[in-house]
Swiss-Prot record:
Residues that coordinate or bind S-adenosyl-L-methionine: 73, 104, 123-128
Organism: Dichelobacter nodosus (strain VCS1703A)
Gene Ontology MF, one: rRNA (pseudouridine-N3-)-methyltransferase activity
Enzyme Commission number, as recorded: 2.1.1.177
Its job: Specifically methylates the pseudouridine at position 1915 (m3Psi1915) in 23S rRNA.
Domain of life: Bacteria
Protein's recorded name: Ribosomal RNA large subunit methyltransferase H
Homology family: Belongs to the RNA methyltransferase RlmH family.
Localization: Cytoplasm
InterPro entries to which the protein is assigned, alphabetical: Alpha/beta_knot_MTases, RlmH-like, tRNA_m1G_MTases_N
Amino acid sequence: MDITIIAVGNKMPDWVNEGFSDYATRFNAEINMQLKEIPLQKRGDDKQIAAARSKESAQILAALAGKDYVVTLDIAGKNYRSEQLAARLQFWQENARSLALIIGGPEGLSAEVKNRAQESWSLGALTLPHPLVRIIVAEALYRAWSINHHHPYHRA
C-alpha cells in the first residue's frame, strides 16, 4: 500500500525531515510512505488568509490521485487509541490501494478538501505544531503496523 502524507508547509528544520524519514522507512515492503509538501502561502490580513487557504486547497486537491482513500487530520475528526488505529490501518490496507493523509496549514483545511475525504482523524484536542504532526502521524502509523504484525515496537 502507498501512503502519502500531504502536508502544507515546506522548508522544515532538519529534525522534522529526519524524524519523519526515520518512521517512514521502518515499514516493510508492503507499505511505502512518502511525503508531498504543499508550499505555505504568504499570509497577512483576512483577505490574504482566505486566498492563501484557497490556493493551498487547490494544490492539495491536485496532489491527490483519483484512487486515493483520503483522510484529513482535523481536530473534529475521530480519535483513535493505538489498537484502534491498527484496526483502521488494516481496513485501509484491505480496502484501498493508496491512502492520502492530509495535514492542513495554520487555518486548517477548506470545505472542498474536507468534502473530498472519506474520513477525518484527530490527534486530540491539543493544538500541535504542524511540523511535529508529520512525525506523530508517521510514528502512529508505524506503531499501528507494529501492532498488526506483532512487532515488539509496541508494548501495551
